[in-house]
């Protein structure tokens, strides 16, 4: 009988006379104890029929039945052992017989669960191992014994017998300590350990029923499903190659590679599991255990004419079976393993009906690499590193101890046992350490069970080695802690640098000189001079005769550097003079006159905003309260126009964004890191209501960052001077000049980016600044901080003096009156005054808006002034477009602006971007803009199928959408938003009608692509539903009812 079934008493089945007693004991919980003995009572009269015996049995009472069926229990549960009668007989230490399954249907009640009674197999194995010998001699052993016995006979020594040799080799195999070869984990360039990947699928993901297992000999790592190991065996686990041919090298019949996961075709041939999967003719007969490879001969015959283009050894190019490039009419062929080792693009796609399609492309026809392809290439390199380790001989020799040899001598004494031990060791060495007993399970016997790791280390390694290992581990830990401390120091210094830059920019706001502002204006004027007409002086013959006062942008830059411009109005006069000279000299030349008019139109808003900034700064300098708070380091809100630029108001992303989270992004203040005062909500709301144009409730912790462009605002071209700056070409040019200025020693951005903003935001900001001039009340976003009030000294606030290391308690407060009363040329000039009022040099005259190092916004900005957002992405179906509801924020701006618990965090400035990166960001911003503004009835492509967008509020206009469909639509939308709460979902209707479940679907914008019917002929793949989409679009254009 099999394992766990016990030994049968007789050939006939013994009848169980009691089942109700077992049910009672099962309900009482006594079956948790181990049944040691069970006496089976058989009927005295075997001639009675089954029906008669059943009637007799049912007439017997329960107590009478229990007396006929005797059981002795050995309790293992302490709770149940208290309920057992003390009159039970002591457990009998013998094993007679047991019943695994009761005789159902013959007598008694059928049991739902019958406890299994098993032998103590461990004891039986130990007693058998003490006497039984599993090893049998082979021809090689007999040859060695015949040679050795001939020599020992001449010397008169004891000869070897087969029984002695088998006994000694058997005990040596079972008692030796055998440890598989240790393999260290792979590490990356930073020294971090990498997880192994499956040798077949190159995937490191695992699950509870599909783990990555390792061969104990060659350390081959494979998935259970990939290699066909449904159940992980106990003890030693070996791959098929190590189990059958551990010493000999095996070759794949389909490719020249000698490493990897092999399966056996027959007694002499082997194949890779990967080759069987990729070659169309071959497959596994048993897909669970991945065995019984079929059609190998057919594959070799059909593909004998193909040769590998990637084989380094050209002699192996014609061997095996090659696969071909998936590109049509391409005849390139290569082995499966050669293709993967060379990094070719190999993809496996599974359709909905379960069909698997495999594609591989040669280097000439390789498609663009995706993120999955790049990740697969990295995993392939990691697997190649592990393959190189397995190319060497996997020798793992066993270890013997003197106590083991003494035990064998007692069992089977022999005078010259050292010869047997040497021959056994050489035989194991010839097999690369593979055991001689194949069917002996590791750990089945206590005598052969592997010792614990601590015991092995204590027996096999000396004390010096252990001490050295401890020292190495200590050094490793100290290096790891040092690296962590270094990272913390770097982060701390970066925060310090960011804080210092924010304080510097804050002071530049209040004390920026007019000369520096003029330099910024001139740099911006240079950027809009695309033709370089006004960049250099005119050197034409007769130019000075016509023009009395020639001037150009280069002359203006020199005058600004020498400080000749005291006001922006003087600079504006020179610009007007330059444009009038151009019109005078080029009279009759339409090209230059048109260029001059365009330049005048673009430069006028720039000069007007610069003049207003100058006026606003002068107004702020005369504000005693503002200047007092600024000098003492109190973080006050500055509503200047420069702060409201689009690049300043954009959200700065966190340095390490987390994927897959549904929380909204935090809008962070790039200027300040302030812990605001706890003010009353009613006061905040009343203060906010005083700000012109503020209709939304804002957070108290937002500070000055609430100035932003609304989601539904349009970017309109500038038509007059009051419309601020809408000349969007300056934005891109300012970015380029910003990148150039970053090479200087100042850690701030270009001056040109300090006063570029959207028209709407600049108007709002001008309205806010008017309060400082006395016309309106100043905004009360923060509680007033008075230096006269002693209670304010206990409030938490971030001061500049704290950052520079001085004690705020002992520091003397600087007032605006003291600053103005102190002579500028006195010797005891205040330190803060010297650091604030010194005019920076020209080389360091970068803009204070370097914090605005921008990131691309989903609300893309037009590049040409005459193009607005409304027609920037106009497609073929633009005649039926209608905007999405403005209540749903999309993209970066969809964030919780009223979150009271968020803290303002200073982020480091983003990295410097090249011109190519800027262009890529513009394109990406345009794509995001297109994806975030899908209109009702917009033609799109979703997963390769033609569809149209259905806006939820306009779904009733579609004739084919009934009330139940709209209810289902909103229900599915809630389900999708629960999974992807941050993404904007779009409801689409597919034109290809397959069934009712697939006609309508909620999708995310990243899966949607705009369908342009004008250029659809250039698309090579076929789009399902395209014909129906064209017909529907034509009906819309004709005004028909759809």
From Swiss-Prot:
Q: Which residues form the signal peptide?
A: none
* Keyword Metal-binding tagged: yes
Per the UniProt entry, the disulfide pairs are: none
Q: Where is the composition biased (Basic and acidic residues)?
A: 735-745
Q: Which GO terms describe its cellular component?
A: MOZ/MORF histone acetyltransferase complex; nucleus
The segments annotated as PHD-type zinc fingers are 195-245, 306-366
Disordered: region residues: 647-864
Tissue-level expression: Widely expressed throughout embryonic development and into adulthood.
Q: Name one GO biological process term.
A: positive regulation of gene expression
Localization, UniProt: Nucleus
Coarse class of the primary localization is: nucleus
Protein known as = Protein lin-49
């Amino acid at each position: 009988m099999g394992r766990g079934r016990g030994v049968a008493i007789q050939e006939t089945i013994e009848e169980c006379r009691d089942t109700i007693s077992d049910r009672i004991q099962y309900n009482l919980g006594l079956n948790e104890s181990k049944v040691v003995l069970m006496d089976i009572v058989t009927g005295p009269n075997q001639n009675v029929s089954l029906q008669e015996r059943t009637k007799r049995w049912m007439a017997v009472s329960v107590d009478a039945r229990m007396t006929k069926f005797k059981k002795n229990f050995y309790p293992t549960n302490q709770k149940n052992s208290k309920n057992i009668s003390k009159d039970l007989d002591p457990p009998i230490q013998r094993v007679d017989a047991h019943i695994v399954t009761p005789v159902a249907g013959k007598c008694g009640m059928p049991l739902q669960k019958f406890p299994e009674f098993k032998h103590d197999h461990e004891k039986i194995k130990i007693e058998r191992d003490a006497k039984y010998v599993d090893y049998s001699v082979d021809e090689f052993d007999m040859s060695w014994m015949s040679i050795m016995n001939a020599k020992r006979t001449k010397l008169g020594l004891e000869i070897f017998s087969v029984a002695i040799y088998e006994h000694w080799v058997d005990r040596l195999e079972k008692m030796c300590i055998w440890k598989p070869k240790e393999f260290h984990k792979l590490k990356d360039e930073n020294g971090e350990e990498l997880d192994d990947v499956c040798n077949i699928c190159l995937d490191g993901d695992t699950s509870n029923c599909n783990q990555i297992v390792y061969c104990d000999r060659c350390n081959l790592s494979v998935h259970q499903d990939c290699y066909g190991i449904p159940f992980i065996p106990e003890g030693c686990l070996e791959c098929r190659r190590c189990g059958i041919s551990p010493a000999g090298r095996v070759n794949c019949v389909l490719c020249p590679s000698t490493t990897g996961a092999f399966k056996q075709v027959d007694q002499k041939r082997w194949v890779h599991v990967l080759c069987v999967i990729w070659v169309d003719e071959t497959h596994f007969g048993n897909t669970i255990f991945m065995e019984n490879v079929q059609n190998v001969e057919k594959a070799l015959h059909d593909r004998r004419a193909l040769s590998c283009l990637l084989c380094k050894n050209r002699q192996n190019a014609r061997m095996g079976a090659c696969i071909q490039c998936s590109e049509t009419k391409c005849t390139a062929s290569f082995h499966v393993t050669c293709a993967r080792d060379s990094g070719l693009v190999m993809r496996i796609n599974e359709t909905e009906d379960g069909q698997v399609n495999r594609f591989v492309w040669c280097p000439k026809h390789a498609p663009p690499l995706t993120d999955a392809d790049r990740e697969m290439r990295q995993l392939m390199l990691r697997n190649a590193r592990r393959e190189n380790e397995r190319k060497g001989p996997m020798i793992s020799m066993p270890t013997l101890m003197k106590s083991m040899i003494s035990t064998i001598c007692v069992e089977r004494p022999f005078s010259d046992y050292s010869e047997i031990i040497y021959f056994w060791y050489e035989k194991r060495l010839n097999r690369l350490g593979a055991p001689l007993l194949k069917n002996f399970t590791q750990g089945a016997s206590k005598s052969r069970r592997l010792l614990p790791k601590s015991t092995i280390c204590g027996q096999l390694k000396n004390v010096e080695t252990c001490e050295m290992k401890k020292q190495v581990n200590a050094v490793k830990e100290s290096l790891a802690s040092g690296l962590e401390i270094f990272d913390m120091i770097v982060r701390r210094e970066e925060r310090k640098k960011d804080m210092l830059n924010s304080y510097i920019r804050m002071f530049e706001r209040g004390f920026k000189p007019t000369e520096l502002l003029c330099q910024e204006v001139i740099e911006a004027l240079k950027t809009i001079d695309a033709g370089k007409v006004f960049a250099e002086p005119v050197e034409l013959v007769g130019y000075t005769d016509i023009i009395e006062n020639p001037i150009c942008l280069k002359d203006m830059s020199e005058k600004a550097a020498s400080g000749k411009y005291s006001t922006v109005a003087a600079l504006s006069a020179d610009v007007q003079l330059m444009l009038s000279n151009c019109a005078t000299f080029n009279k009759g030349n339409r090209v230059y006159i048109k260029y001059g008019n365009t330049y005048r139109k673009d430069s006028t808003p720039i000069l007007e905003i610069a003049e207003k900034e100058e006026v606003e700064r002068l107004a702020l300098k005369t504000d005693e309260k503002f200047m007092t708070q600024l000098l003492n380091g109190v973080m006050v809100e500055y509503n200047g126009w420069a702060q409201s630029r689009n690049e300043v108001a954009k959200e700065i992303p966190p340095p390490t964004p987390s994927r897959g989270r549904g929380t909204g992004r935090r809008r962070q203040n790039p200027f300040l890191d302030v812990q605001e005062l706890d003010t009353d909500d009613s006061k905040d709301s009343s203060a906010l209501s005083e700000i012109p144009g503020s209709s939304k409730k804002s957070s108290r912790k937002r500070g000055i960052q609430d100035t932003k462009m609304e989601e539904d605002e349009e970017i309109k071209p500038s038509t007059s001077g009051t419309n601020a700056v809408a000349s969007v070409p300056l934005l891109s040019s300012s970015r380029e000049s910003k990148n150039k200025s970053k090479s200087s020693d100042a850690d701030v951005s270009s001056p040109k980016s300090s006063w570029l903003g959207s028209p709407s935001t600049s108007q709002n900001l001008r309205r806010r600044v008017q309060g400082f001039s006395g016309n309106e009340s100043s905004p009360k976003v923060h509680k007033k901080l008075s230096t006269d009030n002693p209670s304010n000294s206990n409030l938490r606030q971030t001061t500049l003096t704290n950052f520079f290391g001085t004690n705020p308690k002992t520091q003397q407060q600087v007032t605006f009156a003291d600053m103005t009363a102190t002579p500028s040329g006195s010797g005891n000039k205040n330190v803060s005054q010297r650091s604030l009022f010194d005019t920076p040099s020209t080389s360091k005259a970068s803009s204070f808006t370097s914090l605005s190092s921008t990131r691309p916004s989903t609300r893309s900005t037009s590049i040409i002034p005459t193009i607005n957002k409304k027609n920037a992405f106009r497609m073929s179906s633009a005649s039926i477009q209608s905007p999405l509801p403005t209540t749903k924020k999309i993209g970066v701006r969809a964030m919780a602006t009223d979150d009271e618990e968020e803290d303002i965090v200073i982020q480091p400035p983003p990295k410097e971007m090249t011109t190519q990166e800027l262009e890529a960001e513009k394109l990406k911003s345009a794509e995001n803009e297109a994806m975030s503004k899908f209109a009702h009835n917009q033609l799109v492509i979703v997963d390769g199928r033609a569809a149209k967008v259905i806006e939820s509020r306009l779904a009733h206009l579609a004739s084919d959408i009934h009330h139940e469909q709209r209810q289902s639509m909103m229900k599915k939308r809630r389900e999708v938003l629960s999974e992807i709460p941050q993404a904007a979902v779009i409801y689409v209707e597919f034109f290809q009608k397959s069934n009712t479940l697939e006609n309508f679907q909620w999708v995310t914008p990243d899966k949607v692509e705009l369908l342009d019917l004008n250029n659809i002929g250039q698309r090579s793949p076929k789009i399902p539903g395209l014909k129906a989409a064209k017909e529907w679009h034509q009906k819309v254009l004709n005004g028909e009812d759809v």
